[in-house]
């Protein structure tokens, strides 16, 4: 059992339209902020933490110049305010071949 306010895995995250949408949002926002051209591939895993909304930590694959890489994105969402913000986006490694 996760501690109150702690991170917990999102069940069925690879098939979740919501998580997929948040991951795509993260890549789009990163591309805008960094003038990058990453292309979303797939969600690898996702966790969520309740913090005046929900903070999602999403591990995803994206192509950078045709090469698959793994990134970690943190997206803060408050659906009742129609608020969504990319908090962090970082490269964590190369995707397995």
Curated annotation (Swiss-Prot):
The record marks 5 as: Reactive site. Gene3D superfamilies: 3.10.450.10. InterPro entries: Cystatin, Cystatin_dom, Cystatin_sf, Prot_inh_cystat_CS. Pfam families: SQAPI. Transmembrane segments: none annotated. Keywords: Protease inhibitor, Thiol protease inhibitor. One of its GO terms (molecular function) is cysteine-type endopeptidase inhibitor activity. A motif (Secondary area of contact) lies at residues 49-53. SMART domains: CY (SM00043). PANTHER family: CYSTATIN FAMILY MEMBER, MULTICYSTATIN. Belongs to the cystatin family. Phytocystatin subfamily. This is Cysteine proteinase inhibitor. It comes from Vigna unguiculata (Cowpea).
